[in-house]
Swiss-Prot record:
It comes from Viola odorata. InterPro entries: Cyclotide, Cyclotide_moebius_CS, Cyclotide_sf. Probably participates in a plant defense mechanism. This is Vodo peptide M. One of its GO terms (biological process) is defense response. It comes from the Eukaryota. The presence of a 'disulfide through disulfide knot' structurally defines this protein as a knottin. This is a cyclic peptide. Belongs to the cyclotide family. Moebius subfamily.
């Protein structure tokens, strides 16, 4: 799978740069 960004995105939004929400976690683009 895609690398984890160390951020959850239960709200559907990621704040980490170059990461996108693959609910419920952010993954590196």
């Amino acid at each position: 799978g895609a690398p984890i960004c160390g951020e959850s995105c239960f709200t559907g939004k990621c704040y980490t740069v170059q990461c996108s929400c693959s609910w419920p976690v952010c993954t590196r683009n």
